[in-house]
């Protein structure tokens, strides 16, 4: 009797690769979501034991504690989203880096490579706006007779105070302090202010240049280029003049400006320095003085100096009833 061999089948619970990976608690690396073999495992083709040919040979279901597709799909979606965001961030950083390199390469290539190395001339690289007011340098202060400026300023102050009604009534004419002495200035400060806005930057020139430095300190870099920190004026009128000259015109062809205050040089109260180059600019010499008239009275004045003294404002500060009161005695309008 021929016995037929009976083939028995059994159900096998098969976990998907992503479900098996998340059941272990290991996070999916978003960089390799599409290349990791654990999340992209190639499934075997259907065989006799996977694809039923008779009764009882259906695909094996998942365990009762697993919900196929829910947690795994959400995790895969989050990993894909994180990968896309990282790719976009890397792309933005690459574009920004390329833009910065292009800008710096163009600026330094023109300023140093072309102007300094090829043309053998000075090149100015602007950095940030400069303060318009700054203290006098030792050289500029030595050229000014500070005692003479102070004496002229005091004379102008006495002139203005002697014409004020309140000062004449309380301190008399000629002017004297409460103890009968002649007022004297105990604080006198000089500084300079640029007429035009200025920009602080780096000035480059070729190493070994024999151009006069006028006492400036230069720093050498690798024996190729020298640099120092300086500032340059920004004049809209001069810029317009250069543009018109480039096209063959001039400001005199279009209009003529007449300023009554322009008497000496470019400006009536400019600092009288010898013109060294085209980058020199006019500066105002300003002063501030304090002249006490008594224990509770103080005169504060300020103005400008060139070959003469011009007062801008004279104030009187007094302490009355425990309060500090300010009286504007003179103001140049």
From Swiss-Prot:
Residues 32-56 are annotated as: Disordered. It is a single-pass membrane protein. Its main location: mitochondrion. The keyword Acyltransferase does not apply. Residues 1-86 form a transit peptide. It comes from the Eukaryota. It is found in: Mitochondrion membrane. The chain crosses the membrane at residues 94-114. GO terms for cellular component: mitochondrial membrane. Keywords: Membrane, Mitochondrion, Transit peptide, Transmembrane, Transmembrane helix. The keyword Membrane applies. Belongs to the AIM39 family. This is Altered inheritance of mitochondria protein 39, mitochondrial.
